[in-house]
């Protein structure tokens, strides 16, 4: 049976980590670079989840600034009128097609009268 040497595999693994740590503080030693890379990968994983929340919050804030009355009442009116648009679509509609958004706003008012 031939003896298997793992030198190439280990070197490739270490080089991959060192390449990912390029530009980091203490990126020349494998042990320090490995800690930094693992921490950065955790932060980027967390950030991908937070980005969804942050954008939803941003769209809601911007829609609230555009609307003449509260955003929550507007969404409630849309649901009552069975208009299914998510927050991103509503915000893009308000930016790109203002007349269409005004018609949508008028439609939400006319079908069921808004109770303020």
UniProtKB/Swiss-Prot annotation:
GO molecular function terms attached to this record: rRNA binding; structural constituent of ribosome
Localization, UniProt: Plastid, Chloroplast
A cellular-component GO term for this protein: ribonucleoprotein complex
Keyword rRNA-binding: yes
Pfam family membership, one: Ribosomal_L20
GO biological process, one term: translation
InterPro entries found in the cross-reference section: Ribosomal_bL20, Ribosomal_protein_bL20_C
Keywords: Chloroplast, Plastid, Ribonucleoprotein, Ribosomal protein, RNA-binding, rRNA-binding
Family: Belongs to the bacterial ribosomal protein bL20 family.
Protein role: Binds directly to 23S ribosomal RNA and is necessary for the in vitro assembly process of the 50S ribosomal subunit. It is not involved in the protein synthesizing functions of that subunit.
Name by which UniProt lists this protein: Large ribosomal subunit protein bL20c
The organism of origin for this protein: Cyanidioschyzon merolae (strain NIES-3377 / 10D) (Unicellular red alga)
Gene: rpl20
């Amino acid at each position: 049976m031939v003896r298997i040497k793992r030198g190439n595999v280990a070197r490739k693994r270490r080089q991959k980590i060192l390449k990912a740590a390029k530009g980091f503080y203490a990126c020349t030693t494998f042990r320090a670079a490995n800690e930094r890379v693992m921490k950065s990968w955790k932060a980027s994983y967390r950030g991908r989840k937070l980005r969804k929340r942050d954008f939803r919050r941003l769209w809601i804030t911007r829609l609230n600034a555009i609307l003449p009355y509260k955003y929550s009442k507007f969404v409630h009116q849309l649901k009552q009128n069975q208009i299914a648009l998510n927050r991103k679509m509503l915000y893009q509609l308000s930016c790109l097609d203002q007349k269409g958004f005004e018609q949508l706003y008028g439609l939400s008012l006319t079908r069921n009268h808004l109770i303020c």
